[in-house]
Amino acid sequence: PISSFFVAGASKRGWTTWTTAAVDSRVIGMAPIVIDMLNVTPSMHHHYKAYGEWSIAIEDYENYNIMEWMNSKEYDKLLKHVEPYEFIEKFSSIPKFLINGTIDEFFVTDSWRFYWDDLKGVKHLQYVPNGNHGLRGDYYNMTLKNLISYYYRVINDIKMPILDWKVHKDSVYVRIDPNQKYSISKWTSNNTKERDFRIWKVGDSSWVQSKIEKNNSGSYVFLKEINEGYTAGLIEVEFNGIEDFPLKLTSGTWIYPDTYPFKEYKPEPPLGTPLLSD
């Protein structure tokens, strides 16, 4: 019988990665891929306030009126059983590698803010610059190699690289163990008109890399860029301590200014029993 395994999957399989790890004690590592919607209710409200619409990528869900059930007792009851965020304490003992795309058709690229701080234990993140929901082309191959590097460390019980980061107001703080072999870059993308970084809004090569000179302390502070419209950014660190198994990790993506162009979604009419009703 199988006594332990590492579970990974993309999109719907990414959701299944979360739910599998929540109930199966044999899971020793996990990598949910392009399913950037943990803590689904605030994530979906974030989605609508950023876009002013539901992305065409989730049209099937819209056609079935799923969003009309949000903020209902029935919807809330369902989430208690199927939303991985409800089982978040189950993941604290499992190494977690979350992989997302910065130009994903489904999800807003700074959705980490609704779950990252609540995830405990060993956790790492990679937002793939210019990676869409399918992480297509070279991005798929590079991401697969990166996932294998993470998997290699888990199954061989190798200490994970230390990368601490925090996005706070106008600044991004990064701390790296200076004894590690690494290189560091900043990636940015600008949309002069909208708070929208989906592939069909910014293209498949809008994220531009700027290499950062290393310092001796391993501590860095970056100011968010002020440009016309909205600017997104992230910090990427490549660790090279293991030959043939480099590992790229990133901070969460930030978007500046951190404002919403649209109001929260209000179903007309809402379905189900309102949460605030008697």
Map each language-model feature to its residues.
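Gly/Ser-rich "nucleophile elbow"/oxyanion-hole loop immediately N-terminal to the catalytic nucleophile
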Residues: 1-11, 26-27
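Short beta-strand immediately N-terminal to the catalytic nucleophile in serine-hydrolase-like folds
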Residues: 7-9, 31-33, 99
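Glycine-rich nucleophile elbow surrounding the catalytic serine of serine-hydrolase chemistry
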Residues: 9-19
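Hydrolase active-site cap/lid region
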Residues: 19-68, 126-129, 134-142
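Serine-hydrolase catalytic core
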Residues: 74-131, 169, 173-184, 191
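Surface beta-strand/loop "capping" patches
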Residues: 149-188, 205-218, 223
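Beta-strand-rich binding/interaction modules
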Residues: 182-189, 195-197, 232-235
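Short, aromatic- and glycine-rich surface loops/edge beta-strands on solvent-exposed regions
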Residues: 228-242
